[in-house]
Amino acid sequence: MSAVKPKFRYRKKFENQQLPNILDQQFFTEQPNRKWTSDMTFIRTITVNVYLDIIIDAFSRKIISWKISPRMTSQFIVELISNALRKRKTSSNLILHTDRGSQYTSHAVRQFLYPNQINHSFSKIGYPWDNAITESFFKYTKKEEYNRRKFHDISEVRKAAFNYIEGFYNTRRPHSANKFMSPNQKELEFYTQ
């Protein structure tokens, strides 16, 4: 006769803390730079596997910042957000919605968001629908670009990401949420009214 030990369950640092879901699947917004969503995905290459991280403006579905790196670090996230802030005029009620990954919940990221007056919103654990805009982007970008070919290294992934995001997705890809306009067309319509 032998005893069966219960399996140890690892608890993440922030699992029991209250991390607010401010966005609460309310993706609609009437103007740019009110609600941003962010996440990262894994892309295989022959030499090194890399991560693509993006920030999408919920208003137009435009990718306003993106970055590729072989490592997921909090500094990587800070640089991504900093890049978005350099490109866009934001207000004090901007919401950045992410998952609860360790990079997003890190001290470095929280310390960067606070002085920039960005309200950080988090998806519920194991609930990707809370970040549906970003998850949808990754679904289609993998289907339309990354899963259709093999990449040798990070430079090939960067080139493919640039061509897909800047040359197709932001400029030409229609979205039903934008009345079938591209993200750039939606923002142009807003700023020329």
Predicted regions and their residues:
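RNase H-like polynucleotidyl transferase catalytic core
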Residues: 1-8, 96-100, 114-133, 149-152
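Basic, flexible linker segments flanking DNA-binding modules
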Residues: 1-31, 127, 182-190
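Mobile genetic element proteins and their domesticated derivatives, centered on retroelements
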Residues: 23, 39, 55, 61, ...
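An active-site-proximal beta-strand-loop segment
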Residues: 29-64, 70-72
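Active-site beta-loop-alpha junctions of metal-dependent nucleic acid enzymes
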Residues: 48, 67-89
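Cysteine/selenocysteine-centered motifs that mediate thiol-based redox chemistry or coordinate metal-sulfur cofactors
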Residues: 91-105
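C-terminal domain-tail junction helix/linker
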Residues: 114-118, 140-193
